Amino acid sequence: MYGLINVGFGNVIIGDRVIAIVNPESAPLKRLKEVAKEEGKLIDATYGRKTRAIVITDSNHVILSAIQPETIASRFMQTFTDIEKLLEEIRQAERRTEE
């Protein structure tokens, strides 16, 4: 229901597949990044810049982004808000056609 979320440099992810958006500085997340790389599930969307966020998906893919986690999260919530507004407009249009 979230649609596509921009993670920087024109790269987008499917919002419904996201489990977490986290800061990459902790040791466990650095290990997670290495494991994902070994398993072929690491996607680097940083374009050579510093990794500022790690996005974890329900398929165990780990996506690196140069965008701050807070920024990605706000885009995530904005997408959700936009979808809710669109659904409400559709519901109102359906009510008008029923009358």
Swiss-Prot record:
Pfam family, one: RemA-like
Xref: InterPro entries: RemA-like (IPR007169)
Family: Belongs to the RemA family.
Name of the featured protein: Putative regulatory protein Kole_1849
Organism, scientific name: Kosmotoga olearia (strain ATCC BAA-1733 / DSM 21960 / TBF 19.5.1)
